[in-house]
């Protein structure tokens, strides 16, 4: 019987290295090997020869030790704490720093588990070390893959060869390696082996700051320290209560606002140079960007992100995106990002089955798979997933100076039965449908954001009546600063679509949102969701002929700006777009050559400036003290009126006529004696309205109306909204 000799431990380790399956390279490579094995071991598969290079000393050739291995048996005559390797690749010499001489360059527990610190340590970080009086710069890589049997760093620098740079298994499920001399802009990925040694698809860095597009989807090294910010004045502005500020958001998709001459994307810098002056002119206070975190599928609009820490490279580098934010801030414009913590796509290079296990999602599809979106749901019951997401939110505030996040699809996270039949979901521990893990995550995230960035704001896109979304966590709420008022959007659009003849039968639809208008801190949103998938453009939602459609839209926008709540318009609303939004094109800028559309653009501009200038229109947006009905239930005329107030007692009267019938002598009761001065009329000539005669100034009369002793006799144009400012004299 033939006896097979068992390979030595050294040979076993070489076999593992050759299969990119070695988890403990620092025990076998570099200068820290057992003394009986030699002074230094190098792993350089494909090299012909390797020599040790120490400054001030003669080169020492290393002995070959198996295929790809080289060893220095006796180093007693050498003194060094830093060395290089002269590697002969088929006659071509390359001088390299050996990564395996840099031992213990990692991070403490708190740095790896505190969200505010994690993005300064995880992923690819540029660091500089001192060795023998010399500074050695390079990139330290840390990745969390607790169930992987092995992990290698691969990239253009090692010809994507997983054998070349095995990473060290560290504590807490983290793998690490430091690569000296690696420049910025280097492509890299991770090559992992699953729990049973099985090969996995090459993975992009979950913490990567920069990424390439199709087909490689590789992560790219990026140094956050380089960009020189110019927004100090903005960053140092006093902390203010956002609920009392005028907040007018311009929702924008970067790839389709405008295109270049040949239909190409504008990059972040080109976009900033054109967009910022436009936002200032139009009176918007903030731009809200649809998701810019790296996403492989452009048609997802960013709502299927893979690289949560990287602004998409479709439009430029992270520095270019910083320039965009910087320029906005220098012009007094805040930047809000759509943030997607609800789900992630199944792309093989992403988070899906990252280490060969469902590391970021629940393996049970009843909790881990979103059947509507064909994507995985983050498992918020796991601490590392919660930390990852909270760290990501903080990262955008700190590293890119953003001012807010709008959290997408909050309802889908709060309810375990969201969009599921009775047999497709698992109840919580109490038998209910609330997702306790999501609730806890939102509370933690909001507390962290407001603790570290007091001037920030968080906004929830939440479509249900879940209580306390924008209430502080110490009062039992989720802690968001604001919530989109989806009910107002749905009801008001449902009403305005009706023919004016029929609107009197739907009057309650218009007035009902005021019953709950102050139950949350609301943003009135006319978002991208309302102008896609056959829903038609806002203009073409309006009934009637061309004149009535345009007048309806003007009246509706005026009504919106008079209502309590912050304002959000999707790009193109101000143009009166006739087409639905198309992410493969650009807005219909040519429409502004027609007065019908130019008038709407001027109206939105003036509404924004009016909203900012009149504290009565914004200071108490989230406080019932700032709103009083003047005419609520005149369904037959389809006219509504209310007053908005500020803390100082200033008042603005808002009247909307939702029919094409003018009201020539319209008496309206008001509570105070004085004079009302016209501020804005959506039917005015400059907005391409009918310019129906209205009073510029009107004084109260001691004639009772609507239960009030004082009243005004007004002229109200057809399909129009009027704003009047009250004064005591």
UniProtKB/Swiss-Prot annotation:
Where does the signal sequence lie? none
The family database entries (InterPro entries) matched by this protein are listed as: A-amylase/branching_C, Branching_enzy, GlgB, GlgB_N, GlgB_N_E_set_prok, Glyco_hydro_13_cat_dom, Glyco_hydro_13_N, Glyco_hydro_b
Respond yes or no to whether keyword Membrane is given for this record. no
The entry sums up its family as follows: Belongs to the glycosyl hydrolase 13 family. GlgB subfamily.
**Assembly and interaction partners:** Monomer.
Gene3D superfamilies, sorted: Glycosidases (3.20.20.80), Golgi alpha-mannosidase II (2.60.40.1180), Immunoglobulins (2.60.40.10)
Q: Which GO terms describe its cellular component?
A: cytoplasm; cytosol
Which organism does this sequence originate in?
Vibrio cholerae serotype O1 (strain ATCC 39315 / El Tor Inaba N16961)
Q: What does this protein do?
A: Catalyzes the formation of the alpha-1,6-glucosidic linkages in glycogen by scission of a 1,4-alpha-linked oligosaccharide from growing alpha-1,4-glucan chains and the subsequent attachment of the oligosaccharide to the alpha-1,6 position.
Active site at which residues? 408 (nucleophile), 461 (proton donor)
State the protein's name.
1,4-alpha-glucan branching enzyme GlgB
What are the BP-aspect GO terms?
Answer: glycogen biosynthetic process
Task: Tell me which domain of life the UniProt entry assigns to the organism this sequence originates from.
Answer: Bacteria
Which gene codes for it? Answer: glgB
EC numbers listed for it are 2.4.1.18
Question: What pathway, per the record?
Answer: Glycan biosynthesis; glycogen biosynthesis
GO molecular function, a single term: cation binding
